[in-house]
Every structure is written in structure tokens, then in C-alpha cells.
Amino acid sequence: MTDDIFLKFLEYIQPETDFDISKSPPKPDYSDDANWAALPAIDGQQFYVPDASFSVMKSDNPVDVFYIHPTGFYEKEWNSNMDKKRSAYERTEIVLANQISAFNNSCNIYAPEYRQATYYSFFDINKNGQQALDLAYTDIERAFDYFIENQNSNKPFIIAAHSQGALLAHRLINQRIDNSNLQKRFICAYVIGYMIPEKYYKEIFPNIK
């Protein structure tokens, strides 16, 4: 893709108004299974395997994985409304199959839907993009809190994420895991597709090794 074509693409998905929290989509209720992209008890693309030689263990694994999916929202609103009839949801299903399915024989998979920020947010030079990402983070934090309180049952857990999900995972680890009682159950973070500056290990999650 040439620079000109990419700039045209960004122009096409640029929201036409500033971010306004009062006009944001309703926040998801994570006690409702419909607001999860993946759960151990519900069949979905997270249980995809390449062929019949692979086995799947959907639940009763000794470890959980909390997965934050990448950006799949390329539209002119700042945040997705999580409508399962829109293309963003189809992209989420694709990444469940080609990313988090890697854990489907070893971990119980939990992946929240969230009001992800539009891809344009990463290129916005004003405060709108950051505000959209902040809104997305509030969903991830609430989903994680619900997961810990209602689904995890004190098991060890992994954080897995990609792209926008990885960026939000950095913040989640800082706000909810680093230097908390959860740290002793936290096995590792597999967060790819977004840079992790070396200074983060001292400033953002200093107690995570």
C-alpha cells in the first residue's frame, strides 16, 4: 500500500465530530454472556483447530487466559457499538480462530467484547483518539474485574492480547495486577503487536518480571 492510498484510507475512516463521552455507545454488562467474544462454555471460533489431529479442551483446564482482541473497527465513529451484525465482529471472530485458539488445549479462554476505538484513533493528533482508547480501556478493566470475581475461581491466569488489545493490556497490568494480590496467580503476559518501551518495566509494571 502506497503512502497516498494509506492516507486516503485514514481520511475515509476519520470521524467527522470530536469525541463526546455523552454520545458513546452504552457500556456492556459483563454478567451477560452476549458481551463476551469467547467463553469456555460457549462454542465459537476460539475452539478452531487446523485438522482432526489436534484436540481441544474447552473447560476444566488448570489455567485461564484473558484475551483482549485487536482492532477490527474501521469506521467513522470513535468507538464501536459492539453490533454483531457489523464487520468489526466478523474480524473479532477471525482473530479468535487465528490467535487465541492456540490456547484451546491448555487454558480456559475468556475474551470480552469491548467498545474498541476506531483504527483512526492511533493517528489522531488531537485528544479524541486517546479519549476513545480510554473509553475502550474502561470496558477491559470492568471485564477483567468481572472475570476475576465471577469466573476465574482463584486459578492462575495469563493475559494475551494483540495490537489495540496489547496497548490496553499494558494499562490493565499496571492498574490491576502489578503490586496486587493477583500478581502471585499471574503467570505471564503474551502481548504482541504494540511496542513495549523498556522504561515500562521500571515505570508501568515495575514488579512484573
Named regions from a protein language model:
Residues 68-69, 160-162, 189-194:
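Short His-Asn-centered micro-motif
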Residues 161-165, 169:
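Gly/Ala-rich beta-loop-alpha elbow adjacent to hydrolase catalytic centers
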Residues 76, 121, 168-169, 198-201:
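Extracytoplasmic/secreted cell-surface and envelope-processing proteins
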Residues 57-63:
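Proline/glycine-enriched tight loop/beta-turn segments at coil->beta junctions
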Residues 33-54, 92-98:
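Short alpha-helical segments and helix-capping/turn motifs at coil-helix boundaries
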Residues 4-30, 67-156:
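Active-site catalytic motif of lipid deacylating hydrolases and related acyltransferases
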Residues 96, 168-177:
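Short, well-ordered amphipathic alpha-helices
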Residues 141-151, 175-209:
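Surface cap/lid and interfacial helix-loop subdomains adjacent to catalytic sites
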